[in-house]
C-alpha cells in the first residue's frame, strides 16, 4: 500500500512537498489507519510555527529538514495486528497530514487508547490519546466536521479561560484578544464573557469587524488601529492569537498597566518577530497540555473532560445555530486541494466563517476497503 505524506520545510513554511512512501508490513501490536478527513485552521499553522520550540514536529517523524504538521480528524482502522482493535473501527485523534498512519496502541480500553510509540512517550499525553467514536462523549453522529474543526480549538479556548481564571486574571479586568475572528479566539471569548466584570475586547482587521460583532461574544470589537479607544491605564491582559510583533509592541507600549501577555497562537505567521526589549511583562507562551495536566492532577481526567465536554455541547450548538450559523464547512479532496488550502491559511487569508475539511487521498479507494 502506498501512502502520501504532505511535507513542509521546517525553516520555510511556504515550501511544501508531496511524497509517496510504501507502507511497511505491520508488526505485532500495531494498527494502520486511513486518515479519512481532517480540519485545517490557523491553529495548525501555530503548530508549525512552534514546531521546534514545543516539539510539535516530534510527533510524526519526517525526512531531515522537513516536518509533518499535526492535524485533528477522523481515521478508520484498515489493518490491525492488535487483538483489541478491529478493522473498521472509527478513531478520533491527532494525525499527520497523510493518507495513512501506523500507531502502536497501549493502555487500550473501551474508550480508546494511547499511542505507545517510543518517540512519542516524552511528549504530552493529551496528544497521544485516541478515542473510539462509538463511545466518545464529545462525539455526535452527523457532526464530525464541526467536531474536527472546533473540538481541539475549543479545548484550547477552555483551558486559556481556565488558566487565567485560576490566576485571578492577574488582577486585570480588561482582556485584549488579537485575531478576534479566529475560531480559537472566539471560543475563548465565549468562555471569558461568562466571568463577571470582564471587558472582553476583540481586536481584528477592519474587514472582520462586522463578523466579530455578529458573534456577540465580545464586549466590543476594535480594529488594530483603535487601541486608543481602550484606556491606557486599564488593568489588562493581552491574549495573543496573532503573533504579530508590531501589534505586541503597540500593546506593550500603550498599556502601562499590562499585567500579563499570554501568547496562544500565530495567525499572522509572516509578521512574527522578537519581543525582546518591550516594556511590561515578558511574553508567556500558553501550552494547553500543561494546564490540562494540572487540572487532571486536581480533578482527575474524568473531572476535567466532564467540565470541558459540557461547555463544548453548549458552544457547538451555538456555533451551528440557524438561521445564522457562525461556521460554513467546505470539503476539499486531493493533494492539489490540500496544498491550496494550506497556502491560503498560512497567508492568513479566507473567510472567517468558513471551516476547511481536507482529505489528502484522491479517492476513498486510495485509503483502503474499510475507510469511509
Label each PLM-derived region with a short phrase:
Residues 293-372:
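C-terminal hydrophobic helical "lid"/dimerization subdomain
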Amino acid at each position: 500500500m502506498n501512502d502520501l505524506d504532505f511535507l513542509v520545510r521546517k525553516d520555510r513554511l511556504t515550501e511544501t512537498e508531496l511524497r509517496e512512501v510504501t507502507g511497511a508490513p505491520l508488526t505485532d501490536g500495531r494498527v494502520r489507519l486511513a486518515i479519512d478527513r481532517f480540519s485545517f485552521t490557523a491553529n495548525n499553522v501555530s503548530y508549525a510555527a512552534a514546531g521546534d520550540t514545543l516539539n510539535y514536529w516530534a510527533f510524526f517523524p519526517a525526512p531531515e529538514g522537513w516536518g509533518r504538521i499535526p492535524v485533528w480528524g477522523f481515521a478508520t482502522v484498515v489493518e490491525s495486528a492488535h487483538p483489541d482493535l478491529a478493522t473498521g473501527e472509527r478513531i478520533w485523534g491527532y494525525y499527520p497530514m497523510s493518507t495513512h498512519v501506523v500507531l502502536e496502541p497501549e493502555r487500550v480500553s473501551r474508550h480508546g487508547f494511547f499511542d505507545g510509540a517510543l518517540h512519542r512517550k516524552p511528549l504530552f499525553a493529551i496528544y497521544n490519546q485516541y478515542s473510539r467514536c462509538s463511545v466518545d462523549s464529545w462525539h455526535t453522529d452527523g457532526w464530525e466536521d464541526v467536531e474536527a474543526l472546533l473540538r481541539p480549538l475549543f479545548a484550547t479556548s477552555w483551558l486559556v479561560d481556565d488558566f487565567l481564571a485560576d490566576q485571578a486574571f492577574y488582577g486585570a479586568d480588561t482582556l485584549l484578544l488579537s485575531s478576534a475572528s479566529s475560531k480559537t479566539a472566539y471560543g475563548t471569548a465565549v468562555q471569558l464573557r461568562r466571568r463577571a466584570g470582564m471587558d472582553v475586547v476583540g481586536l481584528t482587521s477592519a474587514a472582520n469587524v462586522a463578523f466579530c460583532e455578529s458573534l456577540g461574544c465580545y464586549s466590543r470589537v476594535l480594529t488594530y488601529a483603535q487601541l486608543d479607544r481602550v484606556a491606557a491605564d486599564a488593568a489588562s491582559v493581552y491574549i495573543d492569537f496573532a503573533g504579530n510583533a508590531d501589534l505586541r509592541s503597540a500593546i506593550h507600549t500603550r498599556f502601562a498597566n499590562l499585567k500579563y501577555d499570554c501568547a496562544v497562537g500565530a495567525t499572522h505567521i509572516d509578521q512574527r518577530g522578537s519581543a525582546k526589549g518591550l516594556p511590561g511583562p515578558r511574553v508567556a507562551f500558553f501550552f494547553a497540555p500543561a494546564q490540562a495536566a494540572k487540572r487532571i492532577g486536581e480533578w482527575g481526567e474524568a473531572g476535567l473532560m466532564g467540565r470541558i465536554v459540557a461547555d463544548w455541547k453548549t458552544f457547538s450548538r451555538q456555533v451551528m445555530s440557524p438561521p445564522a450559523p457562525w461556521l460554513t464547512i467546505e470539503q476539499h479532496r486531493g493533494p492539489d486541494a490540500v496544498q491550496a488550502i494550506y497556502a491560503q491559511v498560512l497567508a492568513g487569508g479566507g473567510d472567517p466563517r468558513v471551516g476547511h475539511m481536507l482529505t489528502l487521498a484522491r479517492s476513498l479507494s486510495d485509503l483502503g476497503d474499510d475507510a469511509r
